[in-house]
Amino acid sequence: MAVRWFSVLVLVFSIGAQALLYDGVHFSGNGETPTFWRNQAKASLLKRANSRRIEGVAKNVIMFLGDGMSIPTVTASRILKGQLAGNTGEEAALSFDKFPNTGLSKTYCQDSQVTDSASSATAYLCGVKANIGTIGVDARVRHGDCASQKGAELTSILDWSMAAGKSVGLVTTTRVTHATPAGLYASVADRGWEGDYYTKNIAGGCKDIAAQLIDDYPNVQVIMGGGRRYFMRADQTDPEHGSNAHYGRRDGRDLIQEWKNGQHNMNRNYHYVWNASAFNSINAANTDSLLGLFEYSHMQYEFERTDPNHEKAGEPSLAEMTQKAIEILKKNPKGYFLLVEGGRIDHGHHEGRAKLALHDCVAFSDAVGMGDQMTNESDTLIVVTADHAHTMSIAGYPQRGNDILGKSAHGSTLTAAGDHRPYTTLLYADGPGWAVTTGNHRPDITNVDTTDKHYLQQAAVPMASETHGGDDVGIFARGPMAHLYTGVLEENEIAHVMAYASCVGDYSNHNDCAAALAGK
């Protein structure tokens, strides 16, 4: 196995109180000199020139999926992270910015220029592009047609990893039955079939997503996210929400209890938790299986998660869930596969509330940093990507350090548009932020607090929910075979590289994998 090494370059600069250290280089926040920029470029160049490919087998694979994490989202979140630390922001770095291998993913699906999270999950987890709105089935399946899914089911990187004897897990801030995590284990003609509330009247007898997880995948050792409502009976009471009559199960099954019974029958030391205190009490060293359902529906936005007035029961952060998952899964000598989704980036964008989306993206970066810190690049492949883009853009010519959530400005002077009214740096092409005043004028936001969490960025086209974007999205990777993610890839290739690197699925015998694994 090739070993990565770096030369060490020490650069000393005279810096101000607000300087930022990144990759050994101090950024002073718009006071950099020509010499500074030359030295910064040399340091970055030498680091990349001295890097070496890691071509061994990936014992472990962690996929971090930022739902809706478009390139503008990455850029704006990077700036926000820097500004939250008291710096100008542009020179900051998200945890995965430092990964040595980057590429682009083409996200269109089989029948749509702009994909959704269901068909995209099928691509990057199952290795096959499929029709919009479907999960874990090939393109023969028509959206919503239960009968057409029979015989068209696909397997995923989770299946391939389990077949190789690895431990597997999933972590998300959405419902664990939502499109991204469901791509690991479910096969449905309609992503909306999360519980039998939706499938009870569908001809063909297709099983809902929650039931597929509990019935067909008892060996998924870590499951964390939200979505208790689809696992509980309709007559049960949720500990936070109360009545479950609307979304609860009509088949009389208590899937949480069934999960417990199944783990008990397999002689596993298991835990089911639904709040932060119970989560914090878990000792990963003696835990075999963990089911954590921390919300009735999706988990809270990161900006609201720590607000006791908003979230009384408490929820772990995405980074904390990532840490616990790795601690549990890493005990398997054959390795593990873990999917971690920052799912509410997408929801913030759909609502037209950029602040919520960006704060969730910063929290997602923290989770990636946790995974990077806890693992070794010599045996663990980490790949970070998004499933699709959004329509948010970074516009105008704001000065360096201008509040990324604020109005475009130079100093105290707001930048005026053609209608002589100010505008924010972040805008959406469509969404709920569209509005006109009497006389069909764009609203004047001069005295509006655009940094408030409830503020809707202005949009050009009226939509109840902002749409996805068809842009390519970034891929950031480190570890064994991470160099295979360079260039422009079809989204379905992402799954194949993970399988190739870890010697599972169709690639279990490539390049004498058996011999390489035997020598570990």
Task: Name each model feature, range by range.
Residues 63-64, 170, 384:
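Structural beta-sheet core signal
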Residues 153, 158, 163-183, 508-511:
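Glycine-rich phosphate/pyrophosphate-binding loops
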